[in-house]
Structure formats: structure tokens, C-alpha cells
């Protein structure tokens, strides 16, 4: 994998995401220290973005948010979502075959780029040419089309991907991909990306939840979590020697079993959070269980929780007005979380932090 940092010289890179759902920003957040300003640039809302560029991005975002919530409308909602979902479908992995033919959606993206979409962003980045790391495919395509002079890296925050992630002509593209798993690496090759441009790195996880190279923070949190999840020591009875070798002696449980339910960026499934609280009301009342509901940066989701819970003061609600504050609060709360409950998303990779995950139905 290409190194962006060494002991002698700290190298910098532009880190670019989009604020369309949390996945692209969550995977960029741990890389923000590489940026000259220590922050992530959002390609769809950066300072000074031309109105014509903003309109293209906003049309896409509005449609995504609308279709995610409209799905709950009986019959017609599910039909509309099925049509949308089909346009983004990931073709079956087997049999192995050439899947490099570009989709209509990808061609449409490039048509906008050829008409000037993204040129302003790339010209601004050219003023201080640094390696470009983006967690969304469109800025990578823009950079390549407008001859960005430095390396272009695309971080993939998904366990499997559609053809949209590979360039129009993938065999000639110089975009390099950082992928979270071997399936995604193989998928890119089916789409025509050269194996030389694919690097299996895993998903970027927050440093504050890991610690240094010794992973002291992660191991300490995992020890406490394991004690909470195994109060009768059944797991420890079987794997105790391995636990002691890797983590040391387990502490006694020091908190109620803590469940975090995370709502997606579009605000869908907030009703499930309220249902969870109501079903565990007795255990909440007795102090046996603690629940954390994650509203993210969606004020309407926080308000929904407050208005629909009988005793909202018994529940912790994570909400922030800006994305960085939200990620900070979320990562801090994760350290004292025993079970993460969420829909299939980038948070699935957080199992690597030693977090068991309950998977809600996909949207």
C-alpha cells in the first residue's frame, strides 16, 4: 500500500467526502489529520461551490432522502424504492465475467462532469497539489477528468459495490482504490480495474477507539465489554486462557448492559428506536439495561425520540448540530457500548472494535 506518512516527514493529503448519508463522512473522519487544515472537504457543500454544481449535488441528495423515507408508504412507496434500488443494483458475483460495461447512471455522471461539474473544486485543489483521498467515487472521477496532477485515491466504505465506483474506462484509469475487504477488491477487478490499483486496507476506524499500535484503548474497552456480555462467565469458561493471554484478567461488570441504536443519515428507522425502548421499558426502569439512541445531526429525529418516548430522560440521545461533533460524541459513547444495533451500513465494519452488532432490516 502506498505510504502517506513516515517518521521523518509528515505528508499531507486532501481528504474529500460528500455529506450524503453518514458513510462517506464517517470513513473520512479518521483521515482528517492528513488534511492541511485538519478537516474534511465536502465536495457537495464546500465554501465557494458554484451554484450550478451545488444544484446537481442537491438534486441527488434530496432524491435519496425522499426515497428512503417514502419507502414506508404502503404499496406505492415500496414500488418506487424497488425501481430506485434496481438502478443501483449490484449484479450477482458468480459466474466470474466481464462487468466493465458502464451503467446509465455512470454515463450520466460523466456527462455532468464533461459540462463542468466539479471543475471548480479540482482547480481549487490544484492550487496546493497534494495526494487526493476521497471516500466517494464522483470526486475521484472529477479529479481524473480535470487532470489533477497528484495521486488520486478512493476509499470504499462498503462491503460490496456497484459498477458506479469504477471509472468510465477502468482499464485506463489511474485512480487507486483502498478497499475494506477481499470481496470488494475482486468486484473492482470484474469492473475492469487493474489489480495494481487495488489495495486491501480495511475500513478506516477512529483512532480514539483504538489507541496506538498496541491498541490499548480498544483492548481496555473490549475487556469491560466482555465482562458485561458474559456475566455468568460461560464464554470465559471455554476461552479464558486465550482472553487472559490477549487481554489480561477481566474486570467485574461496572455498568448496565448498554445497547446503542443508530439511525441512518436519512433518518429512516427512527420508529424502531422507540419500539426498542418501549419493549425494554421494565429492564430500563430496573437499571438492568441502558439504551443510547443515535439521532446524528438530524434534529427531527431527536425531536421524534423526545416526543414519542414515555420517559426520554431514561434514555441517552446522541445529537449534534455538526458532523464532527456528532462523530466525536458517537465514538466516545461507543467505548461504553456493549451492543450496537443498526441497519446494514458502514457501521458493520465497527465489529472490528470488538462490538457485537444486531443488524436491523435493510432499508
Where are these regions (language model features)?
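A nucleotide-sugar donor-handling region in carbohydrate enzymes
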Residues: 175-273, 294-299
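Hydrophobic acceptor-binding patch used for acceptor engagement in glycosyltransferases
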Residues: 339-340, 356
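A short, Lys/Arg-enriched amphipathic alpha-helix followed by its capping loop at the start of a domain
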Residues: 27-39, 128, 279-287
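Gly/lys/ser-thr-rich phosphate-binding loops in alpha/beta enzymes
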Residues: 1-55, 184
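Catalytic binding pocket for nucleotide-activated donors in carbohydrate/polymer assembly enzymes
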Residues: 347-363
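Conserved N-terminal ligand/cofactor-binding loop architecture of enzyme catalytic domains
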Residues: 29-120, 296-301, 308, 312-315, ...
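Active-site and donor-binding regions of nucleotide-sugar-utilizing enzymes
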Residues: 22, 27, 33, 79-207
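Donor-nucleotide binding loops and adjacent catalytic segments primarily
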Residues: 244-339, 346-347
Amino acid at each position: 500500500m502506498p505510504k502517506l506518512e513516515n517518521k521523518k516527514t509528515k505528508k499531507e493529503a486532501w481528504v474529500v467526502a460528500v455529506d450524503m448519508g453518514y458513510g462517506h463522512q464517517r470513513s473520512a473522519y479518521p483521515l482528517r489529520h492528513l488534511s492541511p487544515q485538519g478537516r474534511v472537504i465536502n465536495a457537495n457543500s464546500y465554501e465557494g461551490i458554484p451554484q450550478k454544481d451545488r444544484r446537481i449535488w442537491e438534486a441527488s441528495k434530496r432524491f435519496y432522502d425522499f426515497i428512503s423515507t417514502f419507502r414506508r408508504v404502503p404499496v406505492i412507496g415500496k414500488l418506487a424504492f424497488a425501481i430506485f434500488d434496481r438502478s443501483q443494483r449490484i449484479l450477482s458475483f458468480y459466474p466470474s465475467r466481464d462487468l466493465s460495461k458502464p451503467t446509465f447512471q455512470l454515463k450520466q455522471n460523466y456527462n455532468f462532469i464533461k459540462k463542468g461539474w466539479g471543475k471548480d473544486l479540482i482547480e481549487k485543489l490544484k492550487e496546493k497539489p497534494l495526494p487526493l483521498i476521497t471516500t466517494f467515487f464522483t470526486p475521484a472521477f472529477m479529479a481524473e477528468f480535470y487532470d489533477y496532477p497528484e495521486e488520486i485515491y478512493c476509499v470504499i466504505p462498503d462491503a460490496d459495490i456497484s459498477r458506479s465506483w469504477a471509472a468510465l474506462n477502468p482499464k485506463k484509469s489511474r485512480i487507486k482504490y483502498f478497499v475494506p475487504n477481499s470481496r470488494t477488491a475482486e468486484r473492482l477487478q470484474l469492473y475492469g480495474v487493474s489489480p495494481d490499483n487495488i489495495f486491501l486496507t480495511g475500513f478506516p476506524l477512529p483512532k480514539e477507539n483504538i489507541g496506538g499500535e498496541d491498541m490499548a484503548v480498544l483492548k481496555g474497552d473490549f475487556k469491560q465489554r466482555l465482562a458485561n456480555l458474559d456475566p455468568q462467565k460461560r464464554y470465559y469458561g471455554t476461552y479464558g486462557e486465550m482472553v487472559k493471554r490477549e487481554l489480561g484478567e477481566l474486570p467485574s461488570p461496572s455498568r448496565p448492559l448498554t445497547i446503542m441504536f443508530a439511525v441512518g443519515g436519512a433518518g429512516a428507522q427512527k420508529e424502531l428506536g422507540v419500539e426498542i425502548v418501549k419493549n425494554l421499558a421494565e429492564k430500563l426502569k430496573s437499571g438492568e439495561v441502558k439504551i443510547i439512541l443515535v439521532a446524528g445531526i438530524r434534529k427531527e429525529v431527536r425531536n421524534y425520540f423526545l416526543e414519542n418516548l414515555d420517559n426520554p430522560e431514561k434514555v441517552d440521545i446522541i445529537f449534534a448540530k455538526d458532523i464532527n461533533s456528532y462523530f466525536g460524541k458517537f465514538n466516545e459513547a461507543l467505548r461504553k457500548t456493549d451492543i450496537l444495533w443498526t441497519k446494514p451500513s458502514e457501521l458493520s465494519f465497527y465489529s472490528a472494535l470488538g462490538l457485537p452488532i444486531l443488524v436491523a432490516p435493510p432499508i
